[in-house]
């Protein structure tokens, strides 16, 4: 059975709108755990636009499930990851002008650099994931780099303007999942997934985790974090193993 990991970055976004102390993403993370999430995700961006260093320090010390740390492949983030010792790091691309991550990491041509970058993290027992598009060459590069997981970017699927385009993206993602699995990579999915479009993956076997943040926190405004997380956990619980 696949599992749910909740991204609490959007709680930090609301807090930073007033540069205050609430809502606290650390408190939100604990509530997500109590509601059934098996992992908490935070992305510490280089510009610190939402999550702050204080947040990841506290999360790493307080959560009872797994902490998945999203980060750019910079020296600063590598040192932070080595210090806080998350369950996994997920390398993602960053552009300062983007509102949110717009696409997958380009691994092609970076195999040597990223292999060397991840080496000290692997030596410490930290798992690794690469956030990539469902592209055959990217998947092959991820395998060459030695990542344990790939998180396949589902944003183009989620944002497709028509059902036919969405189906085409779905096919591309499913092909990417199968190829990743054939190469021995574990597969997570994330970006833009919500309570409706996630149903398209109900019969797709072998997905380890779904990484979901925005849609859960959006629903939480109306029904609360506990109910919003439990609703998503219940949907995923019925998916293929």
Swiss-Prot record:
Main subcellular location: cytoplasm
MF annotations from Gene Ontology: pyridoxine 5'-phosphate synthase activity
Enzyme Commission designation: 2.6.99.2
Keyword Transferase in record: yes
UniProt-annotated location(s): Cytoplasm
Binding site for 1-deoxy-D-xylulose 5-phosphate: 9-10, 45, 50, 100
GO cellular component, one term: cytosol
Keywords: Cytoplasm, Pyridoxine biosynthesis, Transferase
GO biological process: pyridoxine biosynthetic process
Family in the record: Belongs to the PNP synthase family.
Function text: Catalyzes the complicated ring closure reaction between the two acyclic compounds 1-deoxy-D-xylulose-5-phosphate (DXP) and 3-amino-2-oxopropyl phosphate (1-amino-acetone-3-phosphate or AAP) to form pyridoxine 5'-phosphate (PNP) and inorganic phosphate.
Protein name, entry field: Pyridoxine 5'-phosphate synthase
Organism, as annotated: Maridesulfovibrio salexigens (strain ATCC 14822 / DSM 2638 / NCIMB 8403 / VKM B-1763)
């Amino acid at each position: 059975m696949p599992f749910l990991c909740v991204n609490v970055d959007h709680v930090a976004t609301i807090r930073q709108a007033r540069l205050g102390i609430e809502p606290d993403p650390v408190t939100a993370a604990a509530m997500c755990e109590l509601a059934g999430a098996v992992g908490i995700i935070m992305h510490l961006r280089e510009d610190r636009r939402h999550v702050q260093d204080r947040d990841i320090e506290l999360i790493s010390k307080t959560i009872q499930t797994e902490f998945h740390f999203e980060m750019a492949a910079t020296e600063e983030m590598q040192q932070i990851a080595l210090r806080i010792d998350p369950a996994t790091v997920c390398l993602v691309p960053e552009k300062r002008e983007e509102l949110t991550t717009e696409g997958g990491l380009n691994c092609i041509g970076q195999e040597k650099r990223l292999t060397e970058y991840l080496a000290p993290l692997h030596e410490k027992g930290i798992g690794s994931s690469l956030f990539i598009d469902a592209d055959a060459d990217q998947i092959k590069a991820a395998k060459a780099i030695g990542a344990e997981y790939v998180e396949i970017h589902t944003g183009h699927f989620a944002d497709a303007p028509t059902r036919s385009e969405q189906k085409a993206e779905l096919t591309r993602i499913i092909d990417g999942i199968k190829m990743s699995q054939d190469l021995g990579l574990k597969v997570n999915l994330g970006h833009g997934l919500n309570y409706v479009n996630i149903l398209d993956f109900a019969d797709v076997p072998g997905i380890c985790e779904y990484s979901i943040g925005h849609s859960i926190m959006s629903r939480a405004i109306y029904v609360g974090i506990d109910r919003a997380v439990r609703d998503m956990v219940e949907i995923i619980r019925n998916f293929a193993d």
